[in-house]
């Protein structure tokens, strides 16, 4: 009789525990199971000016891109972090990328946007076929190599960015998605226009950052889509770039404000399209850029893992 009573109590206890477990799971926030959306937006307009003018970057309007895109992405459910002007130092960008790689989870979506100047950097490691790395220019990166003054430590090299992207893609896994937008340029002339006119604002420089004094000659690659390496356990990667390596990225004026053309047309597309695993929106952006007669000399480039 005692044994039967004991067994009955065990069954009742197990049943109660199971019900409690189900109740706890039901009470857990739905967000723990849903895909999380993360966005890091970096945009620089006003770079520091140095005594040596060749070390300084011209004024552009990268911060406008961030202000344009931030509310749109927030409305789509993204947790948005922004870094603009003085806050967009190399250290700050690196810190945000590292944090992103540590906080994302399997199945998450990540959107990274970089708006500012770009520059080709002489490849010291020897991993680039053409002898040049590509770099995004944070707020505290100078344009000119100067021994014992500035040697490029604040340039955000493509090698460095790719390391963080690999970590993020591995963390979110094959069910996640990673988008990267680079509204910069590595072949511009950095012409400084007047704020109250329709003067040309160009992102980037045609002067390579070189320790040896090497002259930069951009590689002529007319491909519009480039395949990047991947692994089965990694999230798909789609990287959008404002122009080909030998072209100039010219800002456009809309409603009395200047924007990077890639950023502007992404914002217009995302007013009606929701970022997801469906990548049709990318080609819609390309078509919008191609239709703009102000941009006939630049062509959007995509790099993708599939």
Model-derived features with residue positions:
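A composition/secondary-structure signal for short, hydrophobic, low-basic-content segments
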Residues: 8, 31-34
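N-terminal secretory signal peptides that target proteins for export/translocation
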Residues: 1-18
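Sec-dependent N-terminal signal peptides
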Residues: 20-29
């Amino acid at each position: 009789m005692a044994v039967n009573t004991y067994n009955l109590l065990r069954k009742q206890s197990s049943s109660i525990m199971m019900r409690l477990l189900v109740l706890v799971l039901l009470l857990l926030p739905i967000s723990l199971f849903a895909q999380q959306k993360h966005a890091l937006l970096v945009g620089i307009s006003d770079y520091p000016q140095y005594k040596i003018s060749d070390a300084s970057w011209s004024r552009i309007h990268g911060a406008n891109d961030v202000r344009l895109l931030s509310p749109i992405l927030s409305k789509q459910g993204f947790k948005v972090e922004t870094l603009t002007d003085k806050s967009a130092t190399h250290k700050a960008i690196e810190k945000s990328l590292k944090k992103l790689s540590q906080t994302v989870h399997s199945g998450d979506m990540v959107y990274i946007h970089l708006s500012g100047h770009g520059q080709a950097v002489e490849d010291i490691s020897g991993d680039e076929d053409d002898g040049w790395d590509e770099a995004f220019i944070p707020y505290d990166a100078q344009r000119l190599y100067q021994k014992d003054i500035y040697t490029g430590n604040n340039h955000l090299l493509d090698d460095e960015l790719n390391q963080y992207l690999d970590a993020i893609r591995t963390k979110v896994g094959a069910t996640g998605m990673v988008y990267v937008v680079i509204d910069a340029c590595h072949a511009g002339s950095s012409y400084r226009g007047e704020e109250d006119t329709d003067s040309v604002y160009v992102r980037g420089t045609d002067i390579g950052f070189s320790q040896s004094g090497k002259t930069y000659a951009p590689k002529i690659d007319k491909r519009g889509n480039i395949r990047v390496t991947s692994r089965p356990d990694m999230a798909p990667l789609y990287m959008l770039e404002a122009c080909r390596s030998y072209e100039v990225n010219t800002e456009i004026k809309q409603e009395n404000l200047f924007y990077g053309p890639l950023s502007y047309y992404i914002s217009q597309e995302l007013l009606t399209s929701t970022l997801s695993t469906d990548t049709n929106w990318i080609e819609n952006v390309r078509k919008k850029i191609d239709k703009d007669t102000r941009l006939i000399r630049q062509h959007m480039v995509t790099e993708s893992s599939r």
